[in-house]
Amino acid sequence: GALEAAYAGAVKARTAALNALQAQVVALPEEARAPLRGKGSSELVRACASMRPGAGSSPETLAKVALRSLARRARMLDEEAKGLEAEIDALTKALAPSTRSLLGAGPHVAARLLLAAGANVSRLRSEASFSMLCGASPVPVSSGRADRHRLSRAGDRRANSALYTMAITRMAHDERTRSYVARRMSEGKTKKDAIRCLKRYIAREAYRALAQDMEALGMS
């Protein structure tokens, strides 16, 4: 939990520094802005971090000081985030190998699932209770149609977020998942409904993997 929080904080601060850097560049006079125009974030950070403002207190000099400071801060935070991500990657591989083996379960997804499971060990006693924990249990909707459901909004937001990330990743990179979603939509379901079905399927996979990992850790 602490590593994920630290990573999220570093990413948020990095984004803020990059946004501030972009804003400073936009505010530059045209002549000073021209060499920086069209650069991507990485190129912009590299260019601004290596600026040499020189002495003096002219507006251009002070602007370059600010740009260099923001760029170096963004670079430092990027390195911090990458370091924390590497720690999370190693930790989840060691603690949750079965969960990490699931398609779409990268370090942050596995960490969120592991944290949710660790905080709610009793919910791992059955697939149904875990699905409810993840907010992946279908709830009937009063729409006049017997086949209309929504997912429960109750449950652990970390686990729900992890399942959603896995679903989107699979839809982007896995042909079988794309075929599954297409088939569900051909049956009359909306894309949102199809994703709900997919999340329920993934919840079943995640339950089995987490149960194995938690048992290996002596937490089941």
Language-model features: where?
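Glycine-rich, often acidic, oxyanion-interacting loops/wings at catalytic, nucleic-acid
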Residues: 2-98
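Short alpha-helical scaffolding segments that buttress acidic/His motifs in well-ordered protein cores
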Residues: 4, 67, 113, 162-167, ...
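Phosphate-backbone recognition surface of nucleic-acid-processing proteins
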Residues: 101, 107-187, 191, 220
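Basic, amphipathic alpha-helical segments enriched in Lys/Arg and hydrophobic/aromatic residues
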Residues: 185-220
